[in-house]
Amino acid sequence: MPADRLTTLEIRAAEQERTIEELSGQIAEQWTVIERMQRKLDALTDRFLALEEQAAPDVPVTKPPHW
């Protein structure tokens, strides 16, 4: 294998390795953001359900007046 071809392959391999490392870092950051957003969504859902329970009083089951 000629030296220049080997050098080209080594350069490509190094570039691909760098790209993979960058993408891996970006994925890790995205997962951190996703986990934080999921926690916020869970907290907001809990707050919403609590407010919904407070706002909607229990409606008693009664028969209409014509019964």
UniProtKB/Swiss-Prot annotation:
Superkingdom in the source lineage: Bacteria
One protein family per Pfam: SlyX
Disulfide bridge map: none
Family stated for the protein in its record: Belongs to the SlyX family.
Protein name, entry field: Protein SlyX homolog
Species of origin: Mesorhizobium japonicum (strain LMG 29417 / CECT 9101 / MAFF 303099)
Taxon lineage: Bacteria, Pseudomonadati, Pseudomonadota, Alphaproteobacteria, Hyphomicrobiales
UniProt gene name: slyX
